[in-house]
Amino acid sequence: MKTKILRNTFLNLGMIFGLAITAHAQNLYVSLQGDLTNEGGSISEYTPTGVQQTFATAPFPRGIAFDNSGNFFVASTDAKVWDHGRVLKFPPSGHQSVLGNAARSFLEGLATDTAGNVYAVALEDTSPDLAGIIYKFAPDGTRTVFGTTPGQTFGLAFDGAGNLYAADAFDVTIYKFAPDGTRTVFVGPSAFTSTQVPAGLAFDSSGNLFVSTLGNRPNDAILVFTPTGMGSTFVTGLNNPHGMAFDAAGNLFVAETIRDGGGDILEFTTAGQRIVFASGLNRPEYLTFGPPR
């Protein structure tokens, strides 16, 4: 059965008030809304020693990612000209710029490939199902349509072979896009229960795809799929898990985005421990690891 996730549910992110308690080799970046104003969004950064600071501000930030050159990209939407999506670029040195635009769209997931191209999923404001268009932005900002999804789509992630995966919550399907843009179904609705829709995506070093699911809080789950699509449950008992990211040591970090206010970042270690990495957050969404800035 199709389950439609209303966009307004995910227009709220939050500022981090919690303090990281574990140090890691790379910094952890988190997109945060703060409130429902154009000025409330920000990106927080945790240093390897666990110190948190605000890296940047941006209206309605969502997906975040680094490329191989150390450029940091943010999927942002300007609500003053609703909806106007923009991919923001933060180089290792220099000033913020706009890599590209997507008019009348709300941007969600974002990912980069090894060639430095940026992929962002834009939810069409005129579509009743908020159908997704995956735009490809070349390093010079040239925009092309890489692919489409039938319904509201959240997370994007690349596997090691250069295939792009997209979590379509409306169709309850994970779509796989070959490097040439050919779309196939990786797993469909039968891979999920009637109370699960896919949201965040992250690959581990073995090529397994981790999928956060929404719709059954406070007993939401993270599922894991092998490269051939065989699924199993990684963990349950979560509250609205969304963005995920692995650190260099293979620990999984998950943002719990509580719609009524609050949220945290959980760490699942390779030893099987579940740790609250940061608490007291107000609706965190997407995560990524990258070099200190």
Question: What do these predicted ranges mean?
Answer:
Residues G50-A56, H95-N101, T142-T148, T182-F192, ...:
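A short beta-strand motif characteristic of beta-propeller blades
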Residues V30, V74, A120, A166-A167, ...:
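Conserved beta-strand element within WD40/beta-propeller blades
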Residues N38-G41, A58-D78, D83-H84, A102-D125, ...:
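Beta-rich, blade/repeat-based domains predominating
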Residues G41-S44, H84-L88, G132-Y135, V172-K176, ...:
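A short loop-to-beta-strand structural motif that recurs across blades of beta-propeller domains
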Residues L11-A20:
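Bacterial N-terminal signal peptides
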Residues M1-L6:
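N-terminal secretory signal peptides that target proteins for export/translocation
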Residues I21-A25:
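Sec/Tat signal peptide C-region and signal peptidase I cleavage site
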